[in-house]
Design a protein with these regions (language model features):
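Alpha-helical adaptor scaffolds
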Residues: 324-358, 365
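Intrinsic disorder/low-complexity segments
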Residues: 1-8, 16, 62, 127, ...
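A beta-strand-loop signature enriched in Asp, Gly, Thr, and Trp
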Residues: 276-294, 305-338
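Short inter-helical turns and helix N-cap capping residues of alpha-solenoid HEAT/ARM repeat scaffolds
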Residues: 357, 387-389
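Iron-sulfur cluster-binding cysteine motifs and their immediate structural context
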Residues: 23, 252-276, 296-320, 379
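Structural detector for internal amphipathic alpha-helices that build alpha-solenoid repeat scaffolds
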Residues: 361-371, 393-402
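Amphipathic alpha-helical scaffolding segments comprising HEAT/armadillo-like alpha-solenoid repeats
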Residues: 342-346, 373-384, 404-405
Length: 405
């Protein structure tokens, strides 16, 4: 029962539950309007989100939902941030030298969609939290679904009146001496990559890692190969200290980007990012960016591959993140000739479905054009008359590039 436990004890129990659930890292962030969220507003206003309109979702008052948790979860007092290591012992996909094969981002090699893997574990942490603070006889509804539906149950415990005291700079730190006698409502909501919040900001303030110049969260021991999951809660837990920035003067990630997607340290223009172009971008890819895409067909890890903090990154122990056969360096002709049925069967349960069949085929013919392998020309000439006009246009470009190289 929560009244018998100090806030710090509940916080420790949550972190222990996260470790038991399989998370390598867990921390607590307070709910505040951090400066980084103001930067997010400016990033959106500058058009750097590209066509990712879900980033621009607004509430009834016209405010960006992701810019402040107070907009979508006014009851939230703490954010539990959990992280899983997805790095494997396999070489980088771009180290595959066969020109007939493409490159896929490391996170998409897995045997199971990471959203499901992380959410399953978040639910275990959420359940442990409820078990610790629910009064006898008051059982909460089943754990949060992937859509992030909030679950609530009344309880007497941590937070109380203090959870409601919010000054201009956000919630006040929880006090171990505090004991609440008035009943409050425990509310939780789980999110994995799809919720209306900027998870990386809260990961920083939960001490998970610092925001690198490549905009990824970097942990001193694990590097940047991390999947993040968050649990919003109405309980005011003991927050961790934000992780210090350890990038120093290094600019390797910025210098290595083949499409110059970084407009400065910590500033990414999605419109030029290979991950965005191969996954989120619909329709045609600007010609001036195609050559820089190399043989990437889904995502890009270059800015992480070159990061010194990833040189000795630990390999994951989670079997779900081991590569599926053929996913590390898939044959380009196989991808380009894939039928709708093949696509559905091959990528069932994979994040690669996000690109859709047309996008993956488009990416494959661009990769053929960048392969330097003229054996692709006959196949590209065939695709130049494809019923998908986007694939056809990119195939013509690729065939011309190979013919004149």
């Amino acid at each position: 029962m929560c009244p018998l436990k100090a806030v710090s004890e509940i916080t420790a129990l949550v972190k222990e539950a996260a470790r038991e659930a399989g998370f390598e890292l867990a921390g607590i962030a307070p709910v505040r309007d951090f400066a980084e969220l103001e930067h997010f507003l400016k990033w959106i206003a500058a058009g750097h989100a590209g066509e990712m309109k879900y980033m621009e979702a607004r509430d009834g008052g016209g405010d960006l939902k992701r810019a402040s948790l107070g907009t979508v979860a006014p009851w939230a007092r703490s954010v539990i941030v959990c992280a899983m290591n997805y790095n494997t012992a396999h070489p980088y996909s771009t180290q595959g030298e066969d020109p007939e094969r493409g490159w896929i981002s490391r996170y998409a090699w897995s045997r199971e969609d990471y959203h499901e893997v992380v959410m399953r574990r978040l639910r275990l942490v959420e359940a442990k939290l409820r078990d610790e603070i629910e009064p006898s006889g008051a059982k909460a509804p089943s754990s949060s679904d992937r859509d992030g539906t909030a679950k609530a149950v009344p309880f007497h415990g941590c937070g109380g009146d203090q959870a409601r005291k919010r000054g201009p700079s956000g919630p006040r730190p929880a006090s171990d001496a505090h004991r609440a006698s008035a009943p409050v409502e425990l509310i939780t909501r789980c999110h994995v990559d799809t919720g209306p919040l900027v998870e990386r900001v809260y990961a920083k303030y939960a001490g998970i890692g610092w925001t690198g110049k490549n905009t990824c969260i970097l942990n001193q021991k694990i590097g940047s190969w991390l999947f993040l999951g968050v649990i919003l809660t109405s309980i005011e837990l003991t927050p961790d200290l934000p992780a210090p920035d350890r990038c120093g003067t290094c600019t390797r990630c910025i210098d290595a980007c083949p499409t110059d997607a970084f407009i400065g340290p910590y500033q990414l223009d999605s419109n030029r990012c290979i991950s965005y172009l191969t996954i989120e971008k619909r329709g045609g890819i600007p010609e001036n960016l195609r050559e820089g895409m190399g043989r990437h067909v889904f995502g890009c890890d270059i800015c992480q591959d070159v990061c010194p903090w990833n040189r000795k990154a630990q390999a994951t122990t989670h079997p779900e993140f081991q590569p599926r056969e053929g996913f590390v360096n898939p044959a380009l002709d196989w991808l380009a000739e894939m039928t709708a049925e093949d696509f559905q069967q091959t990528f069932r349960g994979s994040p690669i479905r996000r690109a859709k069949r047309g996008g993956l085929r488009r990416n494959a013919v661009v990769a053929m054009g960048n392969s330097g392998d003229r054996r692709f020309v006959p196949l590209l000439e065939k695709f130049a008359t494809d019923e998908d006009s986007v694939v056809a246009e990119h195939a013509k470009w690729a065939a011309r590039k190979l013919s004149t190289s």
